[in-house]
A protein has these predicted regions:
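N-terminal nicking endonuclease/strand-transfer module with a His-rich metal-binding environment
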Residues: 1-196
């Protein structure tokens, strides 16, 4: 595993990579342990994401305040279920990894859910109101994050948390668009959209 902020591996005192103490991992439309190869197969099938500088995946983070754990009873397992429900509803037809861990950055204790989707849709879905183009609902086309889509995602997170009384949600769904080998976006780093 790696630190969320630096993306550097977490190492033990001997320099060996270690897993986080508590994490949950699921795949949608893929096996979580073969996500990368399954995405590459789909990309090859549709002849997409062949160039180095193309965006291969999108990374969303739903982060909860530590008080949601302490005062509202949020657990890593419950956050994972919320993340899975959110991903199924908001990224249908995409291959996705949903991973939750409970230690937060620098062991802050804030539970957060990572959702990483293949930039290419695997299955056709019904057209959604936030989609700008008809092709966005079709298999083989790339994920397009419009202003309307981002607004929709923000509201979905807020509604999900209000429904469960996680009112202290740190409302920051971060978007990281990554290529396989380097980050692409603003300031030569990750492109992020804050949900505040």
């Amino acid at each position: 595993c790696s630190s969320d902020l630096t993306q550097k591996p977490i190492l033990d005192e001997e320099g060996h990579m270690i897993l986080r103490e508590e994490y949950y991992l699921d795949g949608l439309n893929c096996d979580p342990f073969s996500f990368a190869s399954e995405c590459q197969e789909l990309n090859s099938y549709y002849h997409k994401n062949k160039n180095f500088n193309e965006i291969k995946s999108h990374h969303y983070i739903i982060s909860f305040d530590p008080k949601d754990r302490d005062e509202c009873g949020l657990t890593g397992e419950r956050a994972q279920q919320l993340g899975l429900t959110f991903a199924k509803k908001n990224f249908p037809g995409h291959q996705a990894l949903v991973c939750t861990h409970t230690d937060g950055h620098n062991e802050s204790g804030n539970i957060h859910v990572h959702i990483v989707i293949n930039s290419l849709r695997k299955y056709d879905i019904p057209q959604e109101p936030y989609m700008e183009f008809d092709c966005e609902a079709k298999a083989g086309y790339k994920h397009h994050l419009s202003t309307a889509y981002l607004t929709h995602l923000k509201q979905e997170v807020i509604d999900m948390c209000k429904k469960k009384d996680y009112i202290r949600l740190i409302c920051s769904l971060l978007l990281k668009e990554k290529s396989q080998k380097k980050n692409i976006g603003h300031n030569a780093g990750d492109r992020k959209s804050s949900m505040n």
